[in-house]
Amino acid sequence: MKQPRIIICRHAESLEDVDNDIYNVLNDLEIPLTEKGVQQAHDFGAVLAQLLKDSEYIRFYTSPGVRNVQTLKIVLPKLSDNNNVEVEVEPLIVKQDWGKITVENRPGIEAERYKAGVLRYTFPTGESVASMIGRLTSFKEKIFGIQKDMEHDIVVFSHGFEFRVLLMIIMGWEEELFESFGNLGNCEYRILTMGEGGEYSLNKPLQKHSFPITRLLKES
C-alpha cells in the first residue's frame, strides 16, 4: 500500500523577492509573481505532475497570498486527468503578518528580529510568533487527521519562513536546529512520507546556512 505523502512547496518568485520597495505599494498578500516566477511555476508544474502521476486522491492547500494562489493555478492544469483533486485556500498557512512594513522601517525591524531570534521577536504592529505557531499547529493536526482517515496525498503551497516553521512542528525540531536552516528557494519543495507507525520522514534535509545565529552570540 502506498504511504500518504505531504509535499510542502514554496511559491514561485514574486515581486517581494526582487524589490522590497513593493511594500510601499502593495499589501504583502497582494504581491504577485514576476514574469520569471510565472515560468518557474510552469516548470514546477511539470515536476509536481510527475511526482503525483500515480496518486488517485490529492488535496491541495494554498495560503491566501496572491503569489501562492497564482503558483497553484499554473500548476493544476499540468496534473494528470487520473488525479482526483480538491483545492482549499487555507488561512491557517498564511504568511506571518509583520504589521506596518515600509522600505524605510524594514531593515531595522529585520535587524531586531534576528537579534532577538526569529521565534521570539514580536512585531510592533504584527502577528505574534505564538499566534503563527498556533495556527500552523492547527493545520498540522488537520492534515494529519485527513491522512489518518484517507489515503490522500497533500500538497501545501506556503511561504519560505512558514514552510520552515511547519516542518519544525511536524519534525519536532529544537529552536537552535530550526534557526540553523535557511529558507528554501522559490518552487523548492520537501516530501514528508508517513511510516507504518504514523511518524513522518523527510525526503531531504534543509540546507544549513553559514551565518552565525545572532541570538546565540548575544547569549554566550
Predicted regions and their residues:
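Generic beta-sheet signal
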Residues: I6, I58, D149-G160
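Active-site signature of alpha/beta-hydrolase-fold catalytic machinery across serine-
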Residues: I74, V165-I169
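Active-site-proximal alpha-helix that buttresses catalytic centers in soluble enzyme cores
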Residues: K2-V85, E127, L136
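Generic enzyme active-site microenvironment
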Residues: C9, E90, F157
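Active-site metal-binding loops of divalent metal-dependent hydrolases
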Residues: A12, G160-F161
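Phosphate-handling substructures
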Residues: L15-D19, E30-P32, P77-S138, L206, ...
